Swiss-Prot record:
Gene label: HSE1
GO BP annotations listed: protein transport to vacuole involved in ubiquitin-dependent protein catabolic process via the multivesicular body sorting pathway
Bias (Gly residues): 539-553, 562-572
Lineage, top ranks: Eukaryota, Fungi, Dikarya, Ascomycota, Saccharomycotina
Organism for this UniProt entry: Yarrowia lipolytica (strain CLIB 122 / E 150)
Name the UniProt record assigns to this protein: Class E vacuolar protein-sorting machinery protein HSE1
Role, per record: Component of the ESCRT-0 complex which is the sorting receptor for ubiquitinated cargo proteins at the multivesicular body (MVB).
Signal sequence segment: none
Cellular component, GO, one term: ESCRT-0 complex
Length: 685
């Protein structure tokens, strides 16, 4: 019967799928599928695919022809030398030349043919058997010079003067955008003065279409006429009108691509004809950096054309057009209501003038409405892209901040002290080691959170004044341990040194002579380590006394149980003398106390005399008849002190009231604090 005019190829289906005219862009998955089919048939794959591609090139759809040319490039790169021989055959080259010389073919397709021939020429340059492609490229370039894209300019670095000029132009544009009172004459005069100092940019850097070039020339001619009229009207301005300089990176924010550009070097930006590129900065003399669809790269200026920003008149005109479109919404709703009513079927539409008028008025706004839809759809895409960039930048910023926070946080924690700030310590005393965190310290020390001061503000002020007059006196650093509530109340207004039981001072009832031989091994204020040992002398008054005693040593109390260096020494809470003369010699067994840790004396440890004072001149001993459940009368005996602590009643109500002041012999102690519990004697009763 009848035979088809076109040969049938087993690859027609996959080639048709990869070059479908309904595709919006190249589908590289389909293109690679075609390459796989060709490689699976080494004998006839190249011949069959050329047959299928030739049929697609003869179609009248521009999209199909463009996708087929893209497929040719991929086949040449992925299917070996046999495929390259088929592409460089005389029949296929003739098909390409026929397509480029056809007047019915779109110009973009002709430009694509020339681009494919140029790329194949560079690829086949080393193979003389494929020179037919190079000959076709030279012939087409000679006959159709308008199809060839301009050559890429060389990448010359911008000099410092050019960069400074661009910066000055940017500042000038910002100043002019903020100024609303400048006239046209002064604006042109400013440009003339600037052009005399700085060389203008060459217009040949940008590519222009013929129609757009004519429009620009007409606009420039009109601007010159308008400038001359303004200069004639303004008698103060004698400068002639000059042409505005070519837009630079300071004045251009967007450019439009006039040719397709495929990036051949790292850092270049690929784009297609008609793409709108956002200008970021100038990198080289004829290259700018821009952003397109989330990609950032450089592009040559001769491949793009600057887009002029709309003038205020154009913006106002566009707003009026949008307003006219939205004003027709009422007529559209009215027309829809009439056509949707029950009487619409009985109406004679051809004779109803109201319906005809409404219908024709709504038809007129249809093109404007479609234009507005495209405009705001593009703006939506731009805003979505901008939001994605912002989210990405914010994520990177947050990650960098999180990575840097542990570094600075760890350094701050390592350099700090648990005792708090150093500004609140009294003068002459080290503040960093005076009171560790969690332990009560002297008043005015910020390192004792959670503990109220144990002295009234008046006495505290007096003590601070005394301490300021005293020489620096180091305090033994304390280690972390837990104290009983009674020990928390036995704070002294004088520095106290604790020693480890018998290793520190031998026996409990040591004499004044033994106490005078104690050494102070901690020296310096800044924690500089031990210094020379200084024995405590028996004479001298290096350590002052509170003003209650007039600066001298007070008389010893008459309490029968006051040991010279007993726990009732300076700083300990006092009890009324003779209140417990008949107290039992052993405490109750229901409240044992934990033993003191190593390095700290038991509560019965004697306190050392202050540095530079004799034992006789030390502060009076305030005593309690029972210390850790042991009568104080037994403390004067020569019984060895062991490291075993004696249990005491662990009852907060047994604590003596806080010391409100110092009192000498013969004076009564202060009254107990209200709501502080019964006196200690009630417990044994």
């Amino acid at each position: 019967m009848f035979r088809s005019s076109e040969p049938v190829s087993p690859l027609d289906d996959v080639v048709t799928k990869a070059t479908d005219e309904n595709l919006t862009t190249e589908n590289w998955q389909y293109i690679l599928d075609v390459c796989d089919e060709v490689n699976n048939d080494p004998e006839n794959g190249a011949k069959n695919v050329i047959t299928s591609v030739t049929k697609r090139l003869n179609k009248k759809f521009a999209n199909t022809q463009l996708y087929a040319l893209t497929l040719v490039i991929s086949l040449s790169s992925n299917c070996g030398s046999k495929m390259q021989q088929a592409i460089a055959s005389k029949a296929f080259v003739k098909t390409l030349m026929k397509l480029a010389n056809d007047s019915a073919v779109h110009k973009s397709v002709k430009s694509k043919v020339l681009e494919v021939l140029e790329q194949l020429t560079d690829e086949y340059k080393k193979d003389p058997s494929l020179r037919l492609i190079e000959e076709a490229y030279d012939e087409l370039s000679r006959k159709k010079p308008d199809l060839k894209a301009p050559a890429k300019p060389e990448k010359h670095k911008i000099t410092e003067q050019e960069r400074q000029r661009e910066e000055e132009e940017l500042q000038m544009v910002l100043a002019l955008s903020l100024s609303e009172t400048n006239t046209s004459g002064s604006f042109q005069q400013h440009h003339q003065t600037n052009s005399q100092i700085q060389p203008p940019v060459n217009n040949s850097h940008f590519a222009t279409d013929p129609h757009q070039q004519q429009q620009q020339q007409q606009q420039q001619h009109n601007q010159q006429d308008y400038g001359q009229q303004s200069n004639n009207a303004n008698t103060n301005n004698n400068a002639p009108a000059v042409e505005d300089p070519t837009p630079t990176v300071a004045t251009v924010s967007r450019v439009k691509a006039l040719y397709d550009l495929n990036a051949t070097e790292p850092g270049e930006l690929s784009f297609r004809k008609g793409d709108i590129i956002t200008v970021l900065e100038s990198v080289f003399r004829d290259w700018w950096r821009g952003s397109l669809r989330g990609q950032v790269g450089i592009f040559p200026l001769n491949y793009v054309m600057p887009i002029a920003e709309p003038t205020p008149a154009e913006i106002e005109k566009e707003a009026q057009e949008e307003l006219s479109v939205f004003s027709q919404s009422r007529n559209i709703e009215k027309l829809l209501a009439l056509l949707s009513s029950q009487d619409a079927a009985r109406l004679n539409l051809a004779e109803n003038e109201e319906l005809q008028s409404l219908y024709h008025s709504t038809l007129a706004i249809r093109p404007k409405l479609v234009k507005l839809i495209d405009k705001y759809a593009q703006r939506k895409d731009d805003l979505v892209e901008l939001n994605e960039k912002f989210v990405k930048a914010r994520r990177v910023y947050d990650d960098l901040m999180e990575a840097s926070m542990p570094q600075y946080g760890g350094a701050a924690a390592a350099g700090g002290y648990a005792g708090g700030a150093q500004g609140g310590a009294p003068a002459g005393y080290p503040s960093a080691q005076g009171a560790p965190a969690g332990y009560p310290g002297t008043s005015g020390t910020p390192g004792t959170p959670g503990y109220p001061p144990q002295y009234p503000p008046q006495q505290q002020q007096q003590q601070q004044q005394q301490q300021q007059q005293q020489p620096p006196y180091p305090v033994q650093p304390l280690q972390t341990h837990q104290q009983q509530p009674q020990q928390q109340q036995q704070q002294t207004p004088y520095p106290v040194h604790q020693y480890d039981n018998t290793q520190a001072h031998g026996r409990q009832g040591s004499t004044d002579s033994g106490r005078s031989q104690r050494m102070y091994s901690q020296g310096g204020q800044g924690g500089q380590g031990p210094t020379d040992l200084h024995p405590a002398t028996t004479g001298g008054s290096g350590y002052g006394f509170p003003p209650q005693y007039g600066g001298g040593a007070p008389s010893a109390p008459s309490a029968p149980h006051g040991g010279a260096g007993g726990p009732g020494g300076p700083g300990g809470p006092s009890a009324p003398s003779g209140a417990h003369s008949g107290a039992p010699s052993a405490p109750p067994s229901h409240a044992p106390a934990a033993s003191a840790p190593h390095g700290y004396g038991s509560p019965s440890t004697a306190h050392s005399a202050p540095y530079g004072t004799s034992p006789a001149a030390s502060a009076p001993a305030r005593h309690s008849p029972y210390i850790n459940g042991t009568p104080t009368s037994n403390l004067g005996q020569q019984s060895p002190v062991t490291s075993q602590s004696i249990p005491i009643p662990n009852n907060n109500n047994l604590a003596a009231p806080p010391v409100q002041g110092l009192y000498s012999h013969g004076t009564s102690p202060p009254p107990p604090v209200p709501n502080a519990g019964p006196p200690p004697s009630n417990f044994y009763e």
